[in-house]
């Protein structure tokens, strides 16, 4: 299954595409769509919509996963983010794709980062899961979007047994994520 994850924003909208293929998580692509802050918001949203639609056509995902809104102290920032999320939801709906939304805390948890962990921890875990070099993910927007896609691949498959004491082989995205997490949590001297 191929999933396009979206980290919405009106200035920088990250997208990341991950596919579960023959028991492996494969990085298909990612990018950051830049909105011109000099443009009126309506024009910026139009441009974001066009670029995200182009990504949907290029990568042909089976589903779109969008990060939800978190609590803001600034109401204006929350409204603008809501508009950017609306653009992502609209582009997916126009493409006829199912859309799934995940809270930021759930996304962090899905990749093994905790609530207090920052974007660097999320990026590090995404690189671990997808076996990417540090130089590949330049912006947090792209790594956050890949984390949202990983969250979707893991969500709903948690019922798959992670591993048994008998050593039976694990299956599904949840097991793949667990396998990739194990080395990341080893102490440096144990690596």
Curated annotation (Swiss-Prot):
Entry keywords, A to Z: Cytoplasm, DNA damage, DNA recombination, DNA repair, DNA-binding, Endonuclease, Hydrolase, Magnesium, Metal-binding, Nuclease
UniProt-listed Enzyme Commission number(s): 3.1.21.10
Keyword Membrane assigned: no
Transmembrane segments annotated in the record for this chain: none
GO cellular component, one term: cytoplasm
Active site residues according to the UniProt entry: 7, 67, 141
GO biological process: DNA recombination; DNA repair
Binding site residues for Mg(2+) 2: 67
Subunit description: Homodimer which binds Holliday junction (HJ) DNA. The HJ becomes 2-fold symmetrical on binding to RuvC with unstacked arms; it has a different conformation from HJ DNA in complex with RuvA. In the full resolvosome a probable DNA-RuvA(4)-RuvB(12)-RuvC(2) complex forms which resolves the HJ.
Family assignment from sequence similarity: Belongs to the RuvC family.
Protein name, UniProt field: Crossover junction endodeoxyribonuclease RuvC
Organism: Myxococcus xanthus (strain DK1622)
